[in-house]
Amino acid sequence: MRSAISLSLLLVFLSRVQSDIVLTQPEADTGKPEGSLRLTCKTSGFSLGSYYMTWVRQVPGQGLEWLVSYHSSSYQYYAPEIKDRFTASKDTSNNIFALDMKSLKTEDTAMYYCAR
């Protein structure tokens, strides 16, 4: 039986209530162990290039785990446990904040959230 890594994604709205600012993610995606996967977060209502963006994840029944905060290629900070496997990036022309993941492990199974 082939095992899979389930990565669920949700819409994440900013903590500040501003109806014109939205972060949108696909509902769910699945990767295979040792495989790779790209998560995307479409942004609107603000200039993506002007802000730090963050990826966090949550394993069911546990708290949020910070993964990366990213402003630009010069200003990016990664959690040590994912530093060599995950890479964040911004496509400011298309307003997309992405997380490229490689060498997936079963412990990467979680809900992934982007946030500003």
Swiss-Prot record:
Keywords annotated in UniProt: Adaptive immunity, Disulfide bond, Immunity, Immunoglobulin, Signal
Region (Framework-3): 85-116
One cellular component term from this protein's GO annotations in UniProt: extracellular region
Disulfide pairings: 41-114
Region of interest (Framework-2), ranges: 55-68
Keyword check for Disulfide bond: yes
Region (Complementarity-determining-1): 50-54
Signal peptide (from-to): 1-19
Region annotation (Framework-1) ranges: 20-49
GO biological process: adaptive immune response
Superkingdom in the source lineage: Eukaryota
Region described as Complementarity-determining-2: spans on this chain: 69-84
The protein, known as: Ig heavy chain V region
Organism field: Heterodontus francisci
